[in-house]
């Protein structure tokens, strides 16, 4: 889903924005009770605090994919996340289940950095350079079309929770991997597995060319030149400031951060790992967290016995995740209550066929 194509697609009536918080909470609570098991609301960790209390499940991308695959009861799945997550939920659920996204503008800039036409142009060039020695691996933060291509070519999806296991498996299948769309997760994972940086190349989808100065025979990992616009804003300078001003503070970051940041942090991991590690830490411990602002704020609220700050004090929330708010959730639920279909996410059968192969490989390995 291209964000530029959907920037003016918000058709929610204005009266929802004029309701009080209390009115909206009461209505959402009422509709949830009426729909019962026919409604399921999965919610990503990066969602707004006003939405999270209504979630039936909260988690990272892997957890939500697993939950979607297991849920067979709910007719309506209202996904509080972004577009690629709702696509994944649609593909993993039955044809009778309906997946909706409260605001169609909730996309992902990283996912949009890997266009299927760019990938189909890249693949034959890479085959010419390396022959049949490459396994494609896509971060779950990608479009259904990208997942489908990867699945059709024997590859798999991956999340930040299972990246080490999945990439290790992938490198056992072929001599090298093509990791997309997030170069940083790919680089950090491969480095953790012992692959030196000089054996990693960059694929530039704009120029449609490989960026690599070494011997091609040494290249083990090809990284698509994409990134997370949120995690790019955590810098080495942020870490230096914490070390200087708060030397006791433990720094934990998401692996979508740059390699330089991850290398200097005390630890890195998925949103699930970050939440679990801080929740289980001893009272009085101090933390600087390098991930999305909504989640950091929630961790602070849930751990009043610890000192927790954002690694970057000027960090903003993920703006597309932030599209999902209480008015849009209520608007969506009222449509379901009235028998109307709105903002359904539906992936076509051909795309689903091969994307499921990539997703199922990941879930089996996880």
Curated annotation (Swiss-Prot):
Q: Which Pfam families match?
A: NadA
Binding positions for iminosuccinate? Answer: 44, 61, 139-141, 160, 254-256, 271
**Signal peptide region:** none
Q: Any idea of its EC number?
A: 2.5.1.72
UniProt keyword Metal-binding present: yes
* Names of required cofactors: [4Fe-4S] cluster
The reactions it catalyses are: iminosuccinate + dihydroxyacetone phosphate = quinolinate + phosphate + 2 H2O + H(+)
- Where does the record say this protein resides? Cytoplasm
Please provide the Gene Ontology terms (biological process) for this protein. 'de novo' NAD biosynthetic process from L-aspartate
InterPro entries referenced in this protein's UniProt entry, alphabetically: NadA, NadA_sf, Quinolinate_synth_A_type3
Q: Which GO terms describe its molecular function?
A: 4 iron, 4 sulfur cluster binding; metal ion binding; quinolinate synthetase A activity
Q: Which GO terms describe its cellular component?
A: cytosol
The record's keywords, sorted A to Z, are: 4Fe-4S, Cytoplasm, Iron, Iron-sulfur, Metal-binding, Pyridine nucleotide biosynthesis, Transferase
- Which residues are recorded as binding [4Fe-4S] cluster? 108, 228, 318
Coiled coil region boundaries: none
Give a short account of what the protein does. Answer: Catalyzes the condensation of iminoaspartate with dihydroxyacetone phosphate to form quinolinate.
Q: What name does this protein carry?
A: Quinolinate synthase
Q: Which organism is it from?
A: Listeria monocytogenes serotype 4b (strain CLIP80459)
What gene, per UniProt, encodes this protein?
Answer: nadA
